Curated annotation (Swiss-Prot):
The protein, known as: Pentatricopeptide repeat-containing protein At2g17525, mitochondrial
GO annotation, cellular component aspect: mitochondrion
Matching InterPro entries: Pentatricopeptide_rpt (IPR002885), TPR-like_helical_dom_sf (IPR011990)
Organism: Arabidopsis thaliana (Mouse-ear cress)
Keyword Repeat attached: yes
Amino acid sequence: MLRILKLSTSSRSVPLTRLWLLQLPCFCSSSSSSSSLLSVPSDDHIVRLILDQKSASGALETFRWASTFPGFIHSRSTYRALFHKLCVFRRFDTVYQLLDEMPDSIGLPPDDAIFVTIIRGFGRARLIKRVISVVDLVSKFGIKPSLKVFNSILDVLVKEDIDIAREFFTRKMMASGIHGDVYTYGILMKGLSLTNRIGDGFKLLQIMKTSGVAPNAVVYNTLLHALCKNGKVGRARSLMSEMKEPNDVTFNILISAYCNEQKLIQSMVLLEKCFSLGFVPDVVTVTKVMEVLCNEGRVSEALEVLERVESKGGKVDVVACNTLVKGYCALGKMRVAQRFFIEMERKGYLPNVETYNLLIAGYCDVGMLDSALDTFNDMKTDAIRWNFATFNTLIRGLSIGGRTDDGLKILEMMQDSDTVHGARIDPYNCVIYGFYKENRWEDALEFLLKMEKLFPRAVDRSFKLISLCEKGGMDDLKTAYDQMIGEGGVPSIIVSHCLIHRYSQHGKIEESLELINDMVTRGYLPRSSTFNAVIIGFCKQDKVMNGIKFVEDMAERGCVPDTESYNPLLEELCVKGDIQKAWLLFSRMVEKSIVPDPSMWSSLMFCLSQKTAIHVNSSLQDIIQS
């Protein structure tokens, strides 16, 4: 058994590593004599010193050292601090030894605070049997375990296994004559909610009511959160109506849940009720409401929500403000976004890198590339460090906007930047797309070749696919492409272009359409030289109407068809003698300011020649007028 109090009181017994402590004012007597006795340290000082130790041995050493002071007797507080450190380092045998010694050392048994500390220590170590055994440990000292001890054990058990916790509640707590309080039921509700046992949660709520324990807001909110997490927001709303005193957390849970389901009306109704009861939702909830409003294009209403929260003393942060900036940018209202940006600074919500990135993206989307570059340069002036998203957004915008050479300059800056670590292929693919869009095929291939040092596997796969598109078999091509995708690779626009042509030539139109959809999803609009191959593929399969619809779809997506887009369709219709559809298609083409080439005139004239002279003259007159 350890003996704490019978250690030598000589200052020479103080460990060398602790001698500096003797110089602390709190440990020195007021006498200037070198032979004066040291004053007795307080419990708080010793507790702090024990808790500051970085090892179990250090904590024990400090504890023993404190015993060397004449007149100092350890208290429950110092023992509790030592138990905490010993539990942190899992010295549980020493904990038991010191517990046995406590009554003799200080004349007092351990109290609830000490037992709770030990329970939590066992819990952190996941020693569930030892956690439960604390009940017997308390009884060993002739003390009846208190409700606080039982609740502490229960709190550990619900995090580990709700079934063990329920069994403990029934067989230990209730069998000992301990009646749970609202905190007890709150712990059980937490365990049931964590395991999504919502039905049992409602049963527990009913047991509380019949037992005369009124559920508080914490109990209700725990069950509400579980309901919302499982998508049962309507049932959560009904449960909320039972609450006599919902609090701000209640509204935060339900408003956020409705926002997650994009149910704007319900979230706004609850927001109004929240305000009317004098509550202000937290900044996370406010941001979610604003985000849903902005997604619906109702940015002005989102601004009103923000201003109401501010006027009621609620907290607003830069993330909430960024939501508005993003909303304005999505609507193309860049001047308003810029004004709000300035207002953010005036109110003390300092813009961060995300704010600037949103503005850059917004300017790029509306074609204001010079403003995007100015914002990029402002970041350096305002001491905002560029990150990968900054570079990637600007390179993408410049490349898509027809300024690939400027995008290349930004790419070079990114390569030299110390804020971007590790090469990522996205901005490089953006540059390739820029070359593709500007019909600079040689530059695109040369750039792809230069990428080999940074992305050897991706470049090797790309050239292999391009080669297979030229002269390989379809099975080999599919295998190589699937392998690239399986490895997480993203094909460049050059690879996609080649694949679309090869698939379309071999009648695999569905595969071609998937590639085009993938391009559009990534923001890369294919040129007519790419999607014309699909149109020819439709015509070969005698699916002219599918081809016509495809052209219309591509035009709606922002792609620009050309003469070669309509030529195979018109020719196929004319061969079939369908003059009405041919003429309608020809008219649509002319309306889009696409000038027909000689072959199209020939096809149309051939088709007309099959009709009567009167019909031919009438149609020719319509063509001339067009």
